[in-house]
A protein has these predicted regions:
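The phosphoinositide-binding surface of pleckstrin homology
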Residues: 1-27
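Structural motif
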Residues: 37-38
Length: 160
């Protein structure tokens, strides 16, 4: 799935816990990248651990300072995004035309972005949340989630 060169990354979020909703479906850690025409969930990336950690810490700092977290990150453009998409089949690309609905739900533990996808007359539901803290043993799982206003992403989708 090739991206057009005129697309622009609107938001790049780190520490995302997301995937398909449903019985016996395990979500994964990844990055959520939003362009003008697509929502992309990247679980396998060419980004080094050190660079990923730096951008994750910057995002955490923006949360603490109550600043806008829906920003692209420096040094990560369309070329890097294309390379990451091609790296693994587990990296998921949803065009806005495939998305039938996008909204967010405020829960006790955090805010979750819900996305309904229509692929070949089948509807699938996905959920994404920004992680605040992790537990690493016995398996890496999220411990806490951020309460986020997902309106900038939902508005971008509805205006497209």
């Amino acid at each position: 799935m090739l991206l057009e060169w005129d697309e622009e990354i609107k938001a790049h979020l780190m520490w995302i816990w997301g995937g398909e909703d449903g019985f016996m479906k395990r979500k994964r850690e990844g990055m959520l990248v939003v362009t003008e025409k697509r929502l992309i969930f990247i679980t396998k990336t060419n980004m080094s651990y050190r660079i990923h950690d730096v951008h994750s810490q910057r995002q955490l700092l923006r949360f603490k300072e109550k600043k806008n977290v829906f920003l692209p990150i420096e040094g990560y453009g369309i070329t890097e995004l294309k390379n990451d998409i091609e790296k693994s089949d587990k990296n998921t690309v949803f065009t806005f035309s495939e998305i039938s609905d996008m909204y967010f739900v405020e829960r006790r533990w955090g805010t979750e972005l819900k996305v309904k996808i229509d692929i070949e007359n089948k509807q699938k539901n996905y959920g994404f949340a920004i992680v605040k803290g992790w537990v690493k043993y016995p398996a890496k799982d999220p411990l806490l989630f951020h309460h986020v206003d997902w309106n900038p992403i939902v508005t971008l989708f509805k205006m497209s």
